[in-house]
């Protein structure tokens, strides 16, 4: 993996972290209906899983 590809993946990880943080803040505000909060919690979990998968790819490719 070249450095440009690595930077692209690291940027994606950062973007996912920012999105997950924004979603978590919205869930914590508790201003939405329960069904919407449940959906947002699911989105947050999916974002976290995606971040972990990308981090694993980066780790494997930089060995």
Positions of predicted regions on the chain:
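Short, charge/polar-rich alpha-helical segments
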Residues: 1-14
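Charged/polar low-complexity intrinsically disordered segments, enriched in acidic residues
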Residues: 12, 16-23
């Amino acid at each position: 993996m070249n450095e440009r590809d690595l930077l692209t993946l690291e940027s994606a990880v950062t973007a996912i972290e920012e999105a997950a943080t924004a979603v978590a803040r919205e869930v914590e505000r508790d201003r939405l209906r329960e069904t919407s909060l449940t959906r947002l919690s699911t989105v947050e979990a999916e974002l976290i899983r995606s971040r972990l998968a990308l981090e694993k790819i980066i780790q494997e490719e930089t060995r």
